[in-house]
Curated annotation (Swiss-Prot):
One of its GO terms (molecular function) is structural constituent of ribosome. Belongs to the bacterial ribosomal protein bL35 family. The gene is MRP35. The lineage of its organism: Eukaryota, Fungi, Dikarya, Ascomycota, Saccharomycotina. This is Large ribosomal subunit protein bL35m. Component of the mitochondrial large ribosomal subunit (mt-LSU). Mature yeast 74S mitochondrial ribosomes consist of a small (37S) and a large (54S) subunit. The 37S small subunit contains a 15S ribosomal RNA (15S mt-rRNA) and 34 different proteins. The 54S large subunit contains a 21S rRNA (21S mt-rRNA) and 46 different proteins. The keyword Ribonucleoprotein applies. GO terms for cellular component: large ribosomal subunit; mitochondrial inner membrane; mitochondrial large ribosomal subunit; mitochondrion. Keywords: Mitochondrion, Ribonucleoprotein, Ribosomal protein, Transit peptide.
């Protein structure tokens, strides 16, 4: 059996359409009619797939800040290394946690949307 180049292209297009239909088939199963409103007009039997993009977490902020109720807390900087020769009094002042300033918490909520 000999198939011409033109027929191969047509068969390829049909296979492509079938593969797209097969991908959408599980999404379309179970509902007989879709209603879509576009520019004030109502279309029946039109299927649309909408994908909502996710907001990204700022990883540097996520490693430094933790959420506590409505605000955020962080550790105090300056205790990790290079502390030889420092007095115990000055090092003790760098212990504990700090609460975020209310003006900065809106910015932190944007950087950490899922925390």
């Amino acid at each position: 059996m000999k198939i011409s180049l033109h027929n191969k292209r047509q068969r390829g297009d049909q296979n492509q359409n079938m593969s797209v239909f097969n991908v959408l088939k599980p999404l379309l199963k179970g509902s007989n009619s879709f209603k879509v409103k576009l520019n004030g007009f109502l279309f029946n039997n039109v299927s649309t797939i909408t994908i909502r993009t996710l907001m990204k977490t700022h990883k540097g902020t996520a490693k430094r800040w933790r959420r506590t109720g409505n605000t955020f807390k962080r550790g105090i900087a300056g205790r990790k290394h290079g502390n030889i020769g420092w007095s115990h009094r000055s090092l003790k002042a760098l212990t504990g946690r700090k609460i975020a300033h209310p003006a900065y918490s809106k910015h932190l909520k944007r950087l950490l949307p899922y925390h």
